[in-house]
Regions:
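Fold-independent oxyanion-binding glycine-rich loops
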Residues: 9, 27, 40, 54, ...
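Short aromatic-enriched loop/helix-cap "lid" or pocket-rim segments at secondary-structure transitions
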Residues: 18-20, 206-210
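Residues at secondary-structure transition points
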Residues: 16, 21, 48, 52, ...
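N-terminal [4Fe-4S]-dependent radical SAM core
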Residues: 1-51, 63-71
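Conserved AdoMet/S-adenosylmethionine-binding subsite of the radical SAM
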Residues: 62-66, 71-74, 78-79, 83-208
Length: 210
């Protein structure tokens, strides 16, 4: 039986995670180790993880189906990195989510096969780009960003450019506003038109708020 570790299911969200009324399903674990992490509980060994089956998660998120249908809302998968759990998400959505708007928040730093598996089910992609400069990206989270770029190019080739929002943060000690603009220009050249710019404000314990 397929199971996945979750850090939370947050219902009745409006205007924060996709279209209309949305339920956020947040997964544990991530391939990155960012210096400032929005959800550090998705990484820690002592996190209060809920291990759930697709059937149990569907029972929870289906409670608000009337709101989804009335507002063109649905479900957003975040984390952590939800694309690490692509098979789980596919099984979950096949239980009955055809009329829901499905959004995924992702770093895209995952194998292409994970992206391909969920491609028929996802309407919107919110991509946490960090920075397009490979040196800045690696200094910030310890990984290369070539996989991010190649996955992004693949989505664009599939005609999804208008369904992608790229998040480009201003990260203290790692990039500048000029770096943000440079990333934006590189992404625009690829065909991306939707961006989310914000600034990290560091607080205690290497967390941040926006």
């Amino acid at each position: 039986m397929n199971r996945a570790p979750l850090i939370g299911i947050s219902r009745l969200r409006m205007g924060t995670d996709g279209h209309g009324v949305t339920t956020l399903v947040a997964f544990h674990d991530c391939p990155l180790r960012c210096k400032y992490c929005l959800n550090p509980q998705s990484l820690t060994d002592d996190a209060k993880v809920m291990v759930k089956t697709p059937e149990v998660v569907m029972q929870a998120i289906r409670k608000d189906e009337l709101y989804y249908l009335a507002t063109n809302g649905g479900v957003t998968f975040g984390g952590g990195e939800p694309l690490l759990r692509a098979e789980f998400i596919k099984e979950l959505l096949e239980l009955g989510a055809k009329q829901w708007h499905i959004t995924i928040e992702t770093s895209l730093n995952v194998p292409l096969q994970n992206l391909v598996l969920l491609f028929p089910y996802i309407h919107e992609y919110v991509v946490d780009i960090k920075d397009m400069n490979p040196c800045i990206y690696k200094a910030y989270n310890g990984r290369d960003n070539e996989l991010v770029k190649s996955n992004l190019r693949w989505l664009i080739e599939q005609g999804k450019a208008e369904n992608i929002t790229c998040r480009i943060p201003l990260i203290p000690e790692f990039n500048t506003s000029e770096d943000q603009q440079s990333s934006k220009q590189e992404l625009e050249a690829m065909g991306i038109t939707r961006f989310d710019f914000f600034k990290y404000r560091t607080i205690i314990n290497n967390q941040y708020d926006r």
